[in-house]
């Protein structure tokens, strides 16, 4: 499946920061270390030189990837007209058949982070949720079989886990 080119504004900024950090901070340090290691003589048995060159290749590969990727990514900001329906960037609280609640945020594939409960817009769950609204039922084909979710809440700002369900976090 093709990778979407959508990203949230904060996701784009994070990738841009990573690019600048690698290019302006980490690469010069590693380049200097490699230069110093090369000055020590025989490079064939010089572990610092060998591993430094390897790290430099990794940095250069990541820098090339980020530079190219940032050129094609499209920043998607929430639109007030989206309220009430699930679209890119939404935080969605769902409940499954076992009455277990889960929260997902629909983000671009470059932002996917299970620890944050951020799922790719290209994932089966996200594709099933797009365009739906509160009280809608969605069925998703997963590697473990079908999963059914009911949409309980949709937001375009983070949920506050410490507040009761459906309480507005601005209060």
Swiss-Prot record:
Domain of life: Bacteria
Keyword Transcription among record annotations: yes
GO MF annotations, alphabetized: DNA binding; RNA polymerase binding
GO BP annotations, alphabetical order: DNA-templated transcription elongation; regulation of DNA-templated transcription elongation
Coiled coil regions, renumbered to chain: 53-75
Record key words, sorted: Coiled coil, DNA-binding, Transcription, Transcription regulation
Listed HAMAP family: GreA_GreB, GreB
PANTHER family to which the protein is assigned, alphabetical: TRANSCRIPTION ELONGATION FACTOR GREA (PTHR30437), TRANSCRIPTION ELONGATION FACTOR GREB (PTHR30437:SF6)
UniProt family annotation: Belongs to the GreA/GreB family. GreB subfamily.
Role noted for this protein: Necessary for efficient RNA polymerase transcription elongation past template-encoded arresting sites. The arresting sites in DNA have the property of trapping a certain fraction of elongating RNA polymerases that pass through, resulting in locked ternary complexes. Cleavage of the nascent transcript by cleavage factors such as GreA or GreB allows the resumption of elongation from the new 3'terminus. GreB releases sequences of up to 9 nucleotides in length.
NCBIfam families referenced in this protein's UniProt entry, alphabetically: greB (TIGR01461), PRK01885.1 (NF002506)
Protein name: Transcription elongation factor GreB
Organism, as annotated: Yersinia pestis
Gene: greB
């Amino acid at each position: 499946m093709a990778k979407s080119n959508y990203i949230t504004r904060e996701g784009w900024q994070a990738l841009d920061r990573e690019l600048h950090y690698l290019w302006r901070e980490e690469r010069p340090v590693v380049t200097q270390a490699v230069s110093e290691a090369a000055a020590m003589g025989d490079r064939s048995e010089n572990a610092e030189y060998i591993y430094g060159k390897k790290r430099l290749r990794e940095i250069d590969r990541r820098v090339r990837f980020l530079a190219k990727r940032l050129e094609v990514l499209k920043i998607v900001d929430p639109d007030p007209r989206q309220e009430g329906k699930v679209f890119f960037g939404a935080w969605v609280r769902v409940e499954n058949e076992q009455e277990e609640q889960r929260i997902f945020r629909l983000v671009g594939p470059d932002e996917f982070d299970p620890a944050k409960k951020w799922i790719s817009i290209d994932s089966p769950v996200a594709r099933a949720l797009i365009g739906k609204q509160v009280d809608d039922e969605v069925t998703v084909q997963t590697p473990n079989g079908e999963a059914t979710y009911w949409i309980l809440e949709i937001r375009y700002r983070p949920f506050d886990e410490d507040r009761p369900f459906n309480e507005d976090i601005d209060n």
